[in-house]
A protein has these predicted regions:
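Alpha-helical segments with a strong preference for the paired helices of cellulosomal dockerin domains
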Residues: 43-77
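Bacterial N-terminal signal peptides that target proteins for export
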Residues: 17-28
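Asp-box/BNR beta-propeller blade signature and adjacent active/binding-site loops
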Residues: 78-475
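Short, low-complexity intrinsically disordered segments enriched in A/P/G/S/L with frequent Arg
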Residues: 8-10
Length: 475
């Protein structure tokens, strides 16, 4: 018997109560295949009897899914084309000056969209170089074609010298079951580079039970730095803006686990956190001493749950010349991070020419149009061009576990869809309930500038992004 290049997924995953049953069934099916000396073909049907039994583990898993009563998701018969014309949600003005930055977006329980941004008023600088930064939201009831009036999420008071002076860089998630909203943000007057344990960049937590109409406010600075009490070098941190990832597999108590990343100082890199109570408390994934991107130094990052329940990290580098993303994987079976990989090849990597910038990471279920095969697609948004231009979405197919069981799997194999021709920077995206991609990014648009950004929204189909190679599966 020989293998077809796929590895047995013998991993314990605390999120899957059927994992041991599936492992036993894998063994039984494989043993039967050997005893019968039959070939398990690429389509999962038995071929002619031969003396060399070739076993495709993906097809074994399909048999097991049938035994356990799992049903494969059914794709829409034809994914409709979408109106991809960008819509300005937050409009930066240069005369008089009024700046918006840092996109975040969630889908509410009833299907409406809530977009968020920093209102930086008359300065485009970050917390520490600016005062009175607010986080605003706008709601769309028609899939992003139009947006309502601004609503206040976190109100910065420029006269304050403490926590309430400024709030920005929102990281957001809507709970899948309850609809509760969570925003984690940077707060206060101290900048990231000047933060100390005695006078740190502060951390805010905002929660809403009514679709963002009202918000409860809590300062959680001591709690967040307290995670790293054993690590005094962690003297500055903030949550990476954009999407907080919610697990589809791990549920503890009332909530599915959420993951996010805080950016630590030079020499520390990014630090991945998780919460099992929807942001009330956080822990470091892999422990407080884990450093998944120590060299080159990790910066703002995003995480996404892989189809097997492990956690994929995609990170911006503090070293601009890296020209790409840094990837790593947390493996629940080994309870450890892997060996970081760099994806910076201009042809097959997540290349970003001399540009260090935040972006978004997403993995969605799709159908490959060439053969109707159900699989997953990794999406990574980032500027492609030099000096923050040409925001694009890179995409990479994930057919089975051999495509995502090592960080190096994400170094190559990416293709690209270009979203804009303009100078453009931070971006985020979520998969909506209908399988489309709600994309929200910073774009110089009509501002005749290389760094004054409007925040633009557009709906994109998987079919559009991949030039028809894949179509979405409704989630």
């Amino acid at each position: 018997m020989h293998w077809t290049g796929r590895r047995m997924p013998f991993r314990y995953n605390e999120s899957d109560n059927l994992s041991m049953i599936k492992i036993c069934l894998q063994s039984v099916v494989l043993l039967l295949a050997v005893m019968l000396s039959q070939d398990v073909g690429a389509q999962g049907v038995y071929g002619d009897v031969n003396n060399d039994c070739e076993v495709d583990i993906a097809d074994v898993n399909e048999v097991i899914n049938v035994i356990l009563g799992y049903t494969a998701p059914v794709p829409p018969p034809d994914e409709p084309e979408l109106d991809t014309i960008p819509v300005t949600v937050f409009d930066t003005e240069l005369s008089p000056r009024h700046y918006y930055r840092i996109p975040a977006i969630v889908q509410l329980h009833d299907g409406r969209l809530l977009a968020m941004a920093d209102d930086r008023h008359n300065s485009d600088t970050d917390i520490g170089g600016n005062r009175g930064i607010d986080i605003l939201g706008k709601v769309s009831t028609d899939g992003g074609k139009t947006w309502g009036e601004p609503l206040m999420i976190a109100n910065g008071a420029s006269f304050s010298n403490g926590f309430n002076n400024s709030h920005g860089d929102a990281a957001a998630v809507a709970d899948r079951e309850t609809g509760r909203l969570l925003v984690m943000c940077a707060s206060g007057t101290q900048g990231f580079l000047s933060s100390t344990l005695q006078n740190p960049l502060r951390v805010g937590r905002y929660m809403s039970e009514d679709d963002g109409q009202t918000w409860s406010e809590n300062e959680v600075t001591s709690e967040m730095y307290g995670i790293f009490t054993e690590c005094p070098e962690v003297n500055s941190l903030f949550f990476s803006s954009g999407r907080i990832c919610q697990s589809r597999r791990i549920k503890v108590g009332d909530y599915y686990r959420i993951y996010s990343v805080v950016d630590g100082p030079m020499g520390v890199g990014c630090l991945v956190l998780y919460s099992d109570d929807f942001g009330l408390t956080w822990q470091a994934l892999g422990g407080p001493h884990a450093r998944p991107t120590i060299t080159p130094f990790g910066d703002e990052a995003k995480v996404e749950e892989l189809p097997d329940g492990n956690v994929l990290l995609s990170c911006r580098s503090k070293q601009t010349g890296t020209s790409g993303r840094l990837f790593n994987i947390y493996n629940y079976f080994t309870a450890s991070w892997g060996e970081m990989a760099i994806s910076n090849d201009p042809e097959g990597g997540t290349y970003s020419e001399d540009c260090s910038c935040n972006g978004e990471l997403l993995i969605v279920p799709v159908v490959r149009t060439s053969d109707g095969r159900n699989m997953h697609l990794a999406l990574q948004s980032v500027p492609r061009g030099k000096g923050r231009q040409l925001v694009s979405i890179y995409y990479k197919p994930l057919l089975d576990e051999s495509d995502y069981d090592e960080p190096s799997d994400f170094s190559m194999g990416w293709q690209r869809y270009q979203v804009t021709d303009n100078y453009s920077a931070y971006s985020t995206m979520i998969a909506t309930a209908d399988g489309h991609i709600a994309f929200f990014h910073e774009d110089c648009n009509d501002n005749n500038s290389t760094s004054a950004y409007d925040l633009l929204f557009q709906q994109l189909s998987i079919k559009k992004i991949t030039n028809g190679r894949y179509t979405a599966i409704k989630q």
